A protein has these predicted regions:
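Flexible, small-/acidic-enriched active-site or ligand-binding loops
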Residues: 142, 190-219
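A short core secondary-structure module
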Residues: 159-197
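Short Gly/Pro-enriched turn/cap motifs at secondary-structure boundaries
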Residues: 120, 135-138, 162-165, 177, ...
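Internal helix-loop-helix
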Residues: 54-126, 164-171
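A structural signal for short hydrophobic beta-strand segments in well-ordered beta-sheet cores
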Residues: 145-148
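Intrinsic disorder at enzyme termini
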Residues: 1-18
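Short secondary-structure junction/hinge motifs that connect adjacent elements
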Residues: 33-55
Length: 222
């Protein structure tokens, strides 16, 4: 039973209501039956990733590149309904959409957009966002990860902590200090020197994959 204390539904248009209803139904039918066991076993229900993509829930606010181009209200409603099932489900979708796909869409080259956005939208690829570090949290000014130019490449060294989706990601958006200031890098996780270890035995967000990332002289083309 959905209780709308603030009468939000009266403010929604038909498309927004339809998407909210479809996600609510998905959570009840697919997330609710498995999420307690996933939480207890410290596992993410990876079998639900493709169905999430089939519903069009990745990169919903992006127009083109295999994304539906919906409004921000719909994205908020999607996250709200997923959160009802488990915060790990919402976290998976919001990281994929807001922290990986959107930076690539907003700041990436056309080549990078064409390479990654369709794959991320269809769940052919999973992404993670590397900002937080053990010593400084999510404060960019305290980052120790650094990148230096080497000809036409960048060499990145450092580590990241508490990274959602890190150990299952195919691509990572990594932030690092450079001589020119803080920069973001799109890194294929198969790059030599990139290591991701899953963090075990958390007290919360147990149905979410959380990882520590290590970068040992990883080479990224400009």
């Amino acid at each position: 039973m959905n209780i709308d204390l603030f009468d939000i539904n009266s403010l929604l248009n038909d498309e927004e209501k339809a998407v909210q209803d479809s996600v609510s139904r998905f959570v009840k039918e697919n997330v609710d039956p498995v999420i307690q066991e996933c939480f207890e076993n410290h596992e993410f229900p990876s079998e639900l990733i493709k169905p999430l993509a089939d519903l069009g829930l990745f990169g919903t606010s992006i127009d083109g590149y295999g994304c539906p181009g919906m409004n921000s209200i719909i994205y908020g409603l999607i996250c709200k309904e997923l959160e009802k099932g488990d915060s790990g489900m919402r976290s998976f979708v919001s990281v994929q959409s807001s922290l990986v796909m959107y930076p690539i869409y907003a700041f990436g080259s056309e080549e990078q957009k064409q390479e990654w956005l369709p794959k991320l939208a269809s769940a052919e690829a999973i992404g993670c966002f590397g900002l937080t570090e053990s010593q400084g949290g999510s404060d960019p000014s305290n980052m120790k990860t650094h990148a230096k130019k080497d000809g036409d490449d960048w060499i990145i060294n450092g580590s990241k902590m508490w990274i959602t989706n890190g150990s299952i990601a195919d691509v990572a958006v990594i932030w690092a200090h450079t001589d020119e200031g803080i920069r973001g890098f799109i890194v294929d996780t198969k790059t030599k020197g990139f290591v991701a270890n899953k963090i075990e035995n958390k007290f919360s967000l147990r149905a979410s994959i959380t990882s520590e990332l290590f970068f040992d002289n990883i080479r990224v083309s400009k």
